[in-house]
Every structure is written in structure tokens, then in C-alpha cells.
Amino acid sequence: MTMRLPVLLLAAVLCLVVHAHEAATIVPTPVQLIEGTGTCKLDTVTVDCRDAALLPAAQYLAQSLAGRATVAATGGRATSVKLALDTTLEASQYRLDIAPGHIDITGGDYSGVACGIATLRQLLPAASGSIEVPCLRITDKPRYGWRGLLLDSSRHFWSVDEVKRLLDLMACYKLNRLHWHLVDDEGWRIEIKRYPQLTGQGAFRPFDSHDLGCEERAAREHNADLRVDRAKMKVDEHGDSVYGGYYTQRQLRDVVAYARERGIEIMPEVDFPGHSRMATTVLPWLSCQGEPSSTLCVGSDATLQFCKNVYDEVIDIFPFAYVHMGGDEVDKRNWQSCPRCRQRMRQCGIASIEGLQGWFVRQLEAYFNAKGRHLVGWDEIADDGLGTGSVVQWWRGWNKGVVERATVQGKQVICSPTTCLYFDYGQDDGTIDEILRYDPRSTAGLSAGQQQLILGMQGNTWCEWIATEARLQYQVMPRMIALAERAWTSDTCRERVVARFHEKLPAQLERLDALHVRYKLPDITGVSEHTLYTGHGVLWPAIAYGKATLRYTTDGTVPTCQSPAITGPVEVTRDTHFTIASFRPDGSRSDMVTATYAQARYMPALDVTPKTDGLLVEWHRNTGGDHCSDIAQGALIARLVSPAVQLPPAIDHDYSVIFKGYLYAPADGIYEFALDSDDGSQWLIDGTLLIDNDGPHSTIVRRNQAALRQGWHATEVHYFDYNDNGGTLHATVRCVDNPALQVTYKH
């Protein structure tokens, strides 16, 4: 069979000639790229597909090139783009051959052809007019077969069109797995025909604390991208405003087909036995007490049958071999007092509540196996006695041993740790580098066989605080591009991967500009939250993207497109509070920082002579408090010594510490202090709170400056990890006037 699609590249196509050296901006980086001679014109093309299995790919390519294509015979001087399979190639491997007048995309399977199309798309520019692509040959394949992204549609709902636009972005960068989180406490989003109440009553909700938080932050920051999307709201039969939505099974099948056309498989997640408050609100008999609960009653045969009935319909909609059952963060307290759960334990010889969850997970595993599906669950299921056909998804970054334990048992693992692959977390240029430096198979202690059990990597985007498509794009991009690079490339030199990516990033941001994607701009650099100066100061921030604009205000208002642009150094002659914002080329705002400039007032050195090197570290029991002031309330475990503000190796639990001692400033000068922590921290100098990074939060860096006279200054740092899940604390001091100078610590 031959299908030929003539495509006229009109206004949707991009207007500049792409030369051979520009092929070097392709992300992910190809394994091999050989430059040819000349160019291939793409004003008019035909797509030649002789394999019926590739017809969806041909349609996808035609849509990518023009957005409008009709089936007809070739003619004139059209460039032929041929799609073909070659079984000698590996899964997802492809070759892209470009010569004058014709382009060949050959894949080891459908996924390989889709990856070749993605590479061709990146060779196309982004404005109307005649286009050419360089003649070349690319031979390419991924390192990891699983290159995924999680989308949470329960906390905030995403329309079919929004999901498809996200799939388009994934396809551009060769991500091939969408993990679709469809059910949670906040909303049931998938039509289950056997239980119509689940969407009839469970798809909409009144505003919850997350919605209110989004609204408050949007008002505070004057950022409409943070507001709850009004298109997802309605007035219910009681006259109340509610939020939500759901997908019909027909819509879901349409999205599945759309994804598969682009080489993407969708793994559905219906989360049991925890995260089930919406299900038990609609069907109270599912819980232990017959009332709304986040946990199902696993002692009830009816509950287990309910789960299987739901999965029957899920499996019928989603053909992918992997189905996610959740299994995380289960509140088991109800099971302790539930007669049915206690009876289940007696009948099955289960000794503990933890064992009861293991029994439930194994029941679902047997069910999935009978259906020809692989069970996937969060890393809490790693020790539930599952077979090697089930997959563990590592998410708890502090639970570092789970990958080794699961792979020793012969289970496959998907790596999506909180440490770098939670895309709902705050981001900066450092988070990009953390993704690029992370290589799951390089986990310490894994044998070669264990390494091969790691399926790949996935970025998780939980949407409690993400309520609009614009904000979703901001949280995901460009981190998703970094994930695509790391999951594809076999280059084991981390620093080379980082440097190469940052060279390519500006070209990728230009592509996102053309697609009207609200990505996060690179960090605003060259400014501190607090800056001291003598005589006069200079404000001169920078951003690593030439098409971005920095604007500022000095009256406390949020900068707009009409605010003054920073095109050079801004002289500061009096105490001033700056608000600086970065703007994309389309005028939309990305990020804001504040910078307070003040005349330096030197802190005198103390008349002390400390004798012992390092800082005294008071290690306390973690009280569960959420402020640094709670640290001292915990019992003292030990007194230790650290050479600087860093956690001593002995501290591997109860991350609740106070550093005390003295800092020696080697010269009069302005010193910049930086405190990076997860969770709360504070830094005091001579009894004055210099940095306040307090409260529960993910990794945040705070900076401040102090003018110090030469000599000793009292220093105190407080730090706690709210969840006691690993401890993240980094602290630095540098002399602004002479960075070569080093401070020392004694007590």
C-alpha cells in the first residue's frame, strides 16, 4: 500500500534556512550525525508509506509539517519523505537520511519511525516562508526504553485538547510514556460504566484548600497563570460553584490513539487502596466505617471485586501492557480497628497491618497477570512479595535502597525520585543540571544485571498547585527537555552532558516561543536578595537567553511590559528595593526576584579567641515541628563537631540540628551568605537573623549579605528536615570584594 500526502507548507511553517551546523541543536543528542552536502527543500512534500502499520505515522508527519494534508498522488517537484521499517534495527532505533529531493526515515519499529519524525521536526524552522533542511545521515537509538512524564488529572483537570498538546510536546523530544494519574482524593476523572456515580458525583468538587491557595498566590503575584481555570467550573444543581471534569471512555480511546500515533504509550493509574477519598465519598461501602475515607477496606470481598471491576474497564480502554495501581501513602489506621480487616488477617495468616497491604497488592497482581498486564506500583510495594513481572516505581528520593532491593528480587524499576524528577517542585537552573547529572543505572552497588532491570526515567507532575495549562507548561518546560536528553543519551560524562545541553537550550527555547509555550526562562542572575554597597552600587542582572527582556520597578509593584527595561548597569545611590521580572519574547512574564540595595553598615568583630577548629553541632530528636524554633525542644542526641556548616556523617536520622561557633572574616568586606535547605533553616551572625529559610519546603536557596569587620563573629545555623527523609543542607560564604578569601570556623 502506498499513501502519498502532498503538503504545502504555509503560514504554520517556519521562515529561515536551516544550515548543517544548526543540526547540532537537536535534543536529545543523536548517537551519530554525519553531515552531507547541500540541502533539501521542503516547500512541497509527499509522504510515501508502503507499510500499513506506519499509516498513523504518515498522518502524524503530514500534520506536523502543515496541519492540513490530503491524500493524492505525487507530482511536480515535491520532496518525497519515505517511511519504512527495518527489522535489523533495534526497538526505537532509527535512521534519518536527507538528500536533495528525498528524505528516508527508517525505524526498527513504529516507535523508531516516530523518533525519526521527531528529529526531522527539530530540523524545521519556525516561521512562514521557504525552508530547507541540511543533507545528513543520523543513526540513533535511546539508552532507556522508558522515557516518561506523569500528568495528574485528579487534583486539577486537563481537557482532552490540553492533554493532546502535552503529548505533542512529549513527541517533539522523543518521550514515549505518559503516566496518566486519573483518580485521587480530589476527583474521579475516568468514566466507569458499571459505576456511573463515580463521575456523576465524584468528578466535581467545591473549592478545596489547594484551589484557594492557587487563587491567593495568583492575586499576590498578579499572575493569572496561577488561578484556577474558570473553564473547569460550573454551577451544580444546588446553585453552588464546583470545579472538575471527567473523560468519557470514547474520549480516552481518542487520546490513546492520538498518543500511539506519536509513538507514545499511556499507562493509566487508578490508585488503590489509598488516595481513595472521592471513591469512598461516592460509594461509602468501600471504606471500613461506611463513611468517606482515604483508604479502602481491604477486608471486604466487595471492595476487592469493585477494584477488579474498575480495572476491567480501564484495561479495555488502555491497550498498554503496564497498568499502575498506586499503592502509596496508605493510611492503615482504619484497618487496625476494622472487624473485616482483622478477620482477613486471621483467615490468611497475616501477622501485621503492613502484611495486609501486601496481601491486597498480590491479589491485584494475580488479577493483572491473568489479564496479560504488568502491575506497576509506587515503591511502597517493593517488599510486598510480588513476582518479577511486576514493576516498582521509585519516587521517595530519601528511600535510596529501594532500587537495589527491587532489582535484587528481579523486579524492573522506573526511576522518578523526588530529588530531581518532581516537576511540580520549584525549579531553577540548578534543577536542570541535577536532571542531566542523574543516571539511574549508575546507582551505587548495582550489578550489570541489576542495571538492565531499570526500565528508565520519568518526570512526575503533581497538580495540587498547578491549575492552568500555562502554569503546567511553566512547571514542565524546559525540565522535560533535560529529562529527554538524559534518558536518551548514552554519554556517561555528566559534565559534558550538562555543558552540551546548555549550548543547545537557547535554540530549543526559540522553538517553544514559536509554539507559544509558557516555559520557564533561565534564572535571573547577577543579583542577590540583599546587596550592600559603599559609595554607590550597581544593579546589572543577566539572563541566559538573548530574546528575553528584564524589567524592573522600585515602588513595590509587579513589573509589566511597560516597566523600564534593563539594557545595561543601573547605578544605585540610595537605599532601593528593586522588583525584577523576566519576560518572554511574546511579552508574558516568567519569573520575579527582589533585590534590596542598602549602604553598608559594618558589624564589629568580637573580642574573642576561640580555640577549637570547626563548629559545635547539637543534634536533637526531631519533634515533628515545622519551625526552627522547635529544634531545641527535642531531646539532645549528641554533641558533634563539623568543619563547616554541613551535616556530620553520623547524622543519618532525626535531621534536627543547631550549629554554634564563630566565623573568622579574613578582611573587612562585604560577605555573601547562601543557605540551601530542605526543609527549614536559619543563619544568625552576631545574634542577628541574616537568612530566614524557615518552614517546611522543598529545596530552596536563600542569600543575604553582611558587612563584616576583620575578626571573629558569632555564627549559629538551625536546620530541620520536617519528614526526616534524608536531610539536605548546603551553606556557603564568599567575600564579594575578594572571592579568593576563605572564612574559617572555630568554637
Model-identified regions with their sequence ranges:
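Bacterial N-terminal signal peptides
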Residues: V7-V17
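Flexible, acidic glycine-rich loops studded with aromatic residues
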Residues: L375-S390, R396-W540
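Short, compositionally stereotyped local motifs that mark structural "simplifiers"
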Residues: R496-E618, T623-Y664, D668-I670, D676, ...
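Active-site neighborhood of glycoside hydrolase catalytic domains
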Residues: A279-T280, P284-G389, R396-R405
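Surface-exposed loop/turn motifs at beta-strand-loop junctions within extracellular Ig-like
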Residues: D109, S582-D586, D679, Y719-D721
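Feature activates predominantly on carbohydrate-active enzymes
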Residues: L89-T295, G299-L304, K308-Y322, Q363, ...
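Acidic, contiguous N-terminal accessory segments
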Residues: A11, A20-R147, L375-W378, A382, ...
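Short beta-strand-plus-loop segments that form exposed binding edges in beta-rich domains
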Residues: E716-N725, V733
